[in-house]
Amino acid sequence: MKRLFWNLKHKKAWLVLLLGTGMILSSCSNIDQSFFRELSVESVEKNTAYNQLPVNSTTFRNLVFGTRSYNDGNYVVVIATETDSSQINFLNGSTNQGTSSLSWGGTLGTTIRQVQNRYSTYPNGVKFLIWNDIAPGSVKWNPYARFPVVDRKNELASQEDKDNSNKLRRSDASAVRYREIVDFIQRTYGGNVANLINQSNVHAQTVGNDVTKAIVIAFRKDNLNKIRANFYGLDNSTNPNAPGSGQGDSTPPASSGEGGGSDGSSGGDSSSGNGQNTTPTSPQSSQPAVQRSQKSYGIKQHAVRVSVDFLNFLDSVYTPLN
């Protein structure tokens, strides 16, 4: 009898361990996948549909850390969702939802045309990569949108409303990926991106409310072979080194948080800026403090502006030679 209980106890322990491991793997599943699409001048001019853009082979983890394996470290990463009106405008120049086939008539496409031959000091110019959250169905809720908070003692509320109280509205693969992306960027760059989510609109009942902002990170390799990460909408006077630019080997941070999940995982490659696994153990503490721009980082003053402002931002990143 004792042996039977011993076996059951240890089988249960192994089951818990396996389940826990599965949870960790699923929470990081999207981070080591390759899903960003290359947006070129040719694609903009031909109005190539988003889902027809070529997928780049670099993993999301390495792109966010800053890697010289892609265009020698000189590239712009754009993360957006079709669920927020300001982000739709940034991409295609309108505020209409349901933009799975983007026209690239907004600030992003206009600026890509303008910089085609602008940065001649870079042999291959500056490359643009984009991933866009596309909500299934006709109702376009932001990946962070939640159901209203309902008191379970409220006799006027339906049981369905009580059951859904404060839960995330979306659990589709695109929403899960979007939340993992934002979570990973926040963990990697800490306070620099603390206000990506507008908490006051998370429970908004109007589809299209701006819950998150378009995330634009411009990476540049300087003359010391360090890759700098520059956030559009921030005061970039103190550009932090990207985690992949020569900060030594360390253990990757776990990406967790509500809304994480798995739609499959590839191992990805472990190389970042200096050809080694240079993920910081404590990404928030490894980055120097960056002062937020009062005029550009509030949710009401979107990171989406007229194209000349975005062009000025890119000029400030890629024109310096130091």
UniProtKB/Swiss-Prot annotation:
PROSITE patterns: PROKAR_LIPOPROTEIN
Covalent lipidation (S-diacylglycerol cysteine), chain numbering: C28
Membrane topology: Lipid-anchor
Pfam families documented for this protein: DUF6856
InterPro entries per record: DUF6856
Disordered, as annotated region: 235-298
Principal location: membrane
Keywords: Cell membrane, Lipoprotein, Membrane, Palmitate, Signal
A single GO cellular-component term on record: plasma membrane
Lipid-acceptor residues (N-palmitoyl cysteine): C28
Species of origin: Mycoplasma genitalium (strain ATCC 33530 / DSM 19775 / NCTC 10195 / G37) (Mycoplasmoides genitalium)
Start-end of Gly residues biased regions: 257-267
Protein name from the UniProt record: Uncharacterized lipoprotein MG348
Ranges of Polar residues composition bias in the record: 235-254, 274-296
Signal sequence, start to end: 1-27
Localization per record: Cell membrane
